[in-house]
């Protein structure tokens, strides 16, 4: 909250994209040891500033927090959305690697327009 307030106070929040999270969550239950394993089917990301619609919650997990149950987002969707917020069209960003043209978002990815301000 302090970072967001400081950027807002300085007039920099609209031009700064804040991203917090990871490409996987944790299993909602113990795995029989002291920890919980990775869970790529249900995870949380936080985006603020930089063209993101504030106060928006997008998607939903099942009642256990195990898997996306509503509006699932792939890591490619997240990358496409972040690139869009930075003013880049992910479909136009290609590079040549091992005799193949590749996009930064691989062969998938859609901008999540519902979170764009």
Label for each model-derived stretch:
Residues 1-117:
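Ligand-binding pockets and gating/stacking loops
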């Amino acid at each position: 909250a302090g970072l967001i307030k400081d950027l807002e106070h300085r007039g920099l929040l609209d031009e700064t994209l804040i991203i917090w999270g990871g490409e996987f969550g944790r299993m909602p239950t113990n795995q029989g040891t002291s920890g919980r394993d990775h869970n790529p089917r249900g995870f949380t990301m936080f985006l603020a500033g930089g063209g993101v619609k504030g106060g928006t919650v997008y998607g939903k997990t099942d009642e256990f927090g195990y898997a996306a149950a509503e509006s699932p987002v792939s890591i490619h969707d997240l990358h496409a959305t972040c690139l869009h917020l930075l003013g880049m069209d992910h479909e136009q960003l290609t590079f040549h690697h091992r005799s193949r043209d590749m996009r930064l978002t691989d062969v998938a990815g859609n901008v999540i327009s519902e979170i764009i301000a």
